[in-house]
Structures are given as C-alpha cells and as structure tokens.
C-alpha cells in the first residue's frame, strides 16, 4: 500500500523539455507507469544496487527493519523509484511525504505513530525539514521513540511514545544542507550518479516497450545521448519523439527521426536547450569566458541562483563545459568548441583548473 501526501517541489522551469523535475501531475502519473518495480528491473547505479541488494537481503534474513537510507544526487536519477523498490522488496508499506509538508511536530508524529512494523517512510527534499520537526525525528531514528508534549504552560509534560521499528528513506538534491546530526543517523548513504548513454538507451527501450512504441537501437541511443544522463528526461523525450513519429512517419523511431524530432524541440546534440545555451553564451560573450560570480551570472540571464546551481550547472560541469573555481564560473575549451569559437587563451581549461 502506498500513501502519498501532497508534495511541494522546489522552484522549477516547467516549460523545459529537458528539465529533470516533473512538469505536471499528469507527467508524474506517466512516470509511475514506467517505474521499475523490483531491483532486478532497475537499470544503472550498479554500486548502489549491489549495496542495497545485500543490505535488504540481510535485513529480511534477520527479520529486521532495513537501516535508514539517505539517497542524494541531482533530480531525476531515480531516488523516488528506489524508495518504492525498497518497500516492495522488503514486503512492507510505504508512506511518502516531503520536507516542506511537515510544518509542525504533530505532522511528523502522526505519520510515525501510524507506521506498521518495518514500514518505509519516504521523505523527499529532506533537507527542507524545519529544525523543530527534525528534533522530533532524532529519537525516532535512534530509539524508535518520540517525545510529545501534553498540555500547555507550567502543567505541560513530556510523554514518550514507542514506535514500531521502521525504515526512513530520505532523498535530497542538496546533501550539503543536511545538518550533521541528521546525516549521522543514516546507516546507508548512497549517491546517485548521472547515467551513461548505454544505460539510458536500455531505459528508453524498456519504456518504449511499455508504451507500445516501435524503436530501433539507434533511435533509443540518439534519445539517450541527449537526455543529460537523466532517466526522467529520457522518458520525457521519448514521449515527444513518439508523437513526432506517429504524425510524421509510420510510428517507428529511428535515429534519423529522433534527430529531427529533437532538433524541432530545440535539444541539441549534447542535450543542451535554449536555457543551457543562454547560460554558456553569457559566460562566453558577456564575461569573456569567465571567471564570473554566480550572482552576476544569474542577473545576466534572468534566473535565480538556485536554478543555476541545482538545475543548469550540474550537467555542464559533469560534462566538462563549465568549471567552478574560487574566482567564479569559467567556460572550458569544450564550451568554445561547442559554439564553434576559438578559445582566446591557450590551455584555457588547464588554466582554469589551477585557479
């Protein structure tokens, strides 16, 4: 059984086809339909999968609750999917909520006291828990107890309530914002990495099969190459390319058709869209390749600092188009080449690394 409280996401760019956050409730429902149910069906993240397989097997063998799990990494990489898989593999219920929803200690206490033995509580955006709610969570994680206040004023007293053993699965895109006391209470900590094109091609092929969409291996790989290492983006691009194939062709997704559809969507050969190119072009042209501070860059392109740091930058840095240095952001030689420009300094990438 899965019960879901209303989730409140961070600021989004919902009109971006390559956004790593769900654009609508309809898209979230689409994602659920494609979500793998078991660990064996989950593609990629081999190290994390291997660890979870061992830990879950051991917990089942001892008939214990799985240790608390912290999943962190960029959005769209499968943190929510893994939480659902953990609950299914352990044969228990899952309760799902998010940090911003838990405004008062009573909100969390109500969830915890309704958990059955070994159930999974999934808290997305756990870094956004309020301090007062987080304090309630500490004894729950360590001792399976919570302290609640009965009464008010001088007559108020603290009462301990015992909880059933449970597993907390926390997910965050900003692990650095977690407090040390909270982070230290997770026995299993796993970072999710961007996917390779081959892994994403396997995900696209599986999703196409579930959607009854005909696709050849080259078509799946072309979509994967432009999906920014993110399964959520790969599945969204697949939906749009499928529409294009049904209208402009016989419905079969080939490499040529995928290329034409993605060019129409303004997604270039490395997965950049208009916003990505706008950011890189600002660094290249307005700030002479950098270094430039993130606040100046945010003002130049009209986006929030958090959007740049959480949404736009990670993929560019991981792919080697942008560098963070003590003096600010710098475009690499790869960024100049992508726009057909000559780097104004010899060894520019090496120079940036030394700053």
From Swiss-Prot:
GO annotations of cellular component type: cytoplasm; Holliday junction resolvase complex
What the entry lists under NCBIfam families is as follows: PRK00080.1, ruvB
The entry assigns this protein to a family as follows: Belongs to the RuvB family.
Which of UniProt's keywords are assigned here?
ATP-binding, Cytoplasm, DNA damage, DNA recombination, DNA repair, DNA-binding, Hydrolase, Nucleotide-binding
| Residues binding ATP, per UniProt | 34-35, 76, 79-81, 142-144, 185, 195, 232
**Which positions are annotated as binding DNA?**
305, 324, 329
**SUPFAM superfamilies (UniProt xref):** P-loop containing nucleoside triphosphate hydrolases (SSF52540), Winged helix' DNA-binding domain (SSF46785)
Single Gene Ontology BP annotation: DNA recombination
In this chain, the stretch annotated as Large ATPase domain (RuvB-L) covers: 4-195
**Can you tell me which residues bind Mg(2+)?**
80
The name under which this protein is listed is: Holliday junction branch migration complex subunit RuvB
Keyword DNA repair present in the record's keywords: the answer is: yes
The source organism is Cupriavidus metallidurans (strain ATCC 43123 / DSM 2839 / NBRC 102507 / CH34)
Its catalytic activity? ATP + H2O = ADP + phosphate + H(+)
Spell out the CDD domains in the cross-references. Answer: AAA
User: Which molecular function term from Gene Ontology is one that the record holds?
Assistant: ATP binding
Compartments annotated for it: namely: Cytoplasm
Domains as described in the record: Has 3 domains, the large (RuvB-L) and small ATPase (RuvB-S) domains and the C-terminal head (RuvB-H) domain. The head domain binds DNA, while the ATPase domains jointly bind ATP, ADP or are empty depending on the state of the subunit in the translocation cycle. During a single DNA translocation step the structure of each domain remains the same, but their relative positions change.
UniProt-annotated stretches for the region Head domain (RuvB-H): 269-355
Which Enzyme Commission number(s) are listed? Answer: 3.6.4.-
């Amino acid at each position: 059984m899965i019960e879901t409280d209303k989730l409140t996401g961070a600021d989004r760019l919902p009109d971006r086809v390559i956004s790593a956050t769900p654009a609508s409730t309809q898209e979230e429902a689409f994602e659920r339909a494609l979500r793998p149910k078991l660990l064996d069906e989950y593609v990629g993240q081999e190290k994390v999968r291997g660890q979870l397989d061992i830990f879950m097997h051991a917990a089942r063998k001892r008939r214990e609750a799985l240790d608390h799990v912290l999943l962190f990494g960029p959005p769209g990489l499968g943190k929510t999917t893994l939480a659902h898989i953990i609950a299914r593999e352990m044969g228990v219920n899952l309760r799902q909520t998010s940090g911003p929803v838990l405004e008062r200690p009573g909100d969390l206490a109500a969830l915890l006291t309704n958990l059955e033995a070994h159930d999974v509580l999934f808290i997305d955006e756990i870094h956004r828990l309020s301090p007062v709610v987080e304090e309630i969570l500490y004894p729950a994680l360590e001792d399976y107890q919570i302290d609640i206040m009965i009464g008010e004023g001088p007559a108020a007293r603290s009462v301990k309530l015992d909880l059933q053993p449970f597993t907390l699965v926390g997910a965050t895109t900003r692990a650095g914002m977690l407090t040390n006391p909270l982070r230290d209470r997770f026995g299993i900590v796993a970072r999710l990495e961007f996917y390779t094109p081959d892994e994403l091609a396997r995900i696209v092929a599986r999703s196409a099969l579930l959607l009854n969409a005909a696709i050849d291996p080259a078509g799946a790989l072309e979509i994967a190459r432009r999906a920014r290492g993110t399964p959520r983006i790969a599945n969204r691009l697949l939906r749009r390319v499928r529409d294009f194939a049904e209208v402009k062709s016989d419905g079969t997704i080939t490499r040529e058709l995928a290329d034409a559809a993605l060019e129409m969507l303004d997604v270039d050969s490395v997965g950049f869209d208009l916003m990505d190119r706008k950011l890189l072009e600002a660094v290249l042209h307005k700030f002479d390749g950098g270094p430039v501070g993130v606040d100046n860059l945010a003002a130049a392109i009209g986006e929030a600092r958090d959007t740049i740091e959480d949404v736009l930058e990670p993929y560019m840095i991981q792919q080697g188009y942008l560098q963070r240095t003590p003096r600010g952001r710098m475009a690499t030689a790869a960024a100049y080449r992508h726009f057909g420009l000559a780097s104004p300094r010899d060894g520019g990438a090496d120079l940036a690394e030394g700053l």
